[in-house]
Amino acid sequence: MLDEVVTDIVARTPVSGGTVDILMYHSIANAPGPTSIAPRQFEAQMSALASSGITLLRMDDVPGHLATGHGRAVAITFDDGFRDFADVAWPVLRSLNLPAMVYLPTDCIDGAENWKGAHRPPRPLMSWEEVRRLASEGVDFGNHTAAHSDLSLLNINQVAEETERACLRMQAEIGFRPVHFAPPYGRSSCDARKVIARHHKTSVGTELATARASSDPHNLPRIEMFYFNNMRHWHAHLDGRGANYLRLRRVIRHVRESFL
């Protein structure tokens, strides 16, 4: 009898906190590969999002929404700081009043991608002058390490050096230390996340899922927007009917990775 009462109470107790779809983009360009989204496609995705009525958050507000918020929210993130963010993505976002976080590999700013797995030909990144202008216009910037390093291959001292060097460069260039982080390739270890947590409020990975109150704030899942090039799937997701599609994409990704 007692077990039945406890079960009933648990079933009727509301789950605290809201949910956040943290969208993941890289480059907005007419180029092949999963890290590029065509400009017209990006504009369609953002227009649909802006019309959806879903709450839009800055990354600063994500932890609070997950802990005590209500309902669905979305945060928009970009990895790597490609120049097309300034030229293509930001004008669209600004026109729709949508906030964005851009994670910068600080050694690569003013240059082009030069890391393992980089696109060929290499895509240019923004300049520090562009970063400063965008920061003044309301774009948020986070830490993507100094050299776009795979943290899973580094020891703890190297992780600390990579993250701190990026923090110091951003402090020097744009006047503040970043408090949000994204490990390159989405890879980090438990020990690396402990180092990251010392100076960053959040860290995002590449697990394909919606962030919830139970999510690790230093390994938050994201929604890879390459999977929503088909606007039918994107509209269904925004309408709250996308769980099965997201689940299918996770299974396909897991199967593909198991053969690598």
PLM feature segments, named:
Residues P14-G17, A50-S51, P91-L98, P124-N143, ...:
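Acidic (Asp/Glu)-rich catalytic clusters
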Residues M1-T77, R83-A86, L153-L260:
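C-terminal active-site subregion of NodB/CE4 polysaccharide deacetylases
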Residues V5-A11, A86-V88, K116-S136:
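Alpha-helical scaffolding within the catalytic cores
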Residues G111-P122, H148-I156:
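Surface-exposed cleft-lining segments at the edges of enzyme active sites
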Residues I28-A31, C108, A147-D150:
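A short, flexible beta-alpha/helix-coil linker loop
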Residues N97-A118:
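A short, conserved beta-to-alpha structural element at the edge of catalytic cores
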Residues L23-S27, D140-H148:
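Histidine-centered catalytic micro-motifs
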Residues T77-F78, G142:
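Generic enzyme active-site microenvironment
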